[in-house]
Amino acid sequence: LSSAASDVYKRQTVERLLHRWGHIVAVGTTSVRTLESLAALAWRIRREGSPDEMRAVGQWELYDIPASYTGREALEELLAYMERNDLGTLKASTQIMIAPLGYRWRIVRAIVTNFHQPKSTLLLLVSAYVGEDWHRIYDYALRNDFRFLSYGDSSLLVNDAPFAG
């Protein structure tokens, strides 16, 4: 999302995410980035007392969150803030980039996504999720004439690596 684009987070959605904890599947890379950005908003609440909805979640902001801060903690903190302030929604925007630089997945457990162009930031996100297996996955797709980009074929990516949730 660009800094001009915004997402609206409903309290009911945060409650549902907690209820389905550990089984959250994001459909599309925008959904991945939106969901993972919740951790940054919650961390702002812990640090600053407010999610500062007027400030976009910065490109590398998620990398500044301590490894010990879990996704469940983040959602609980966000929900408590919304309840305390009688908020039905939060509006925020994100500029995050998820790259294979030691990113700790906090919310998303599986991803449904298209096959992305080489050297794209979306492929970085896929690589951050599945690690070096992205080569094997994309080689298979190329050898079997999968369609790439928005109207192409999709994949279900499930990562069994340790989860910071």
Residue map of PLM features:
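Surface-exposed, charge/polar-rich loops and edge strands
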Residues: S6-G165
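Extracellular interaction modules
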Residues: L1-A5
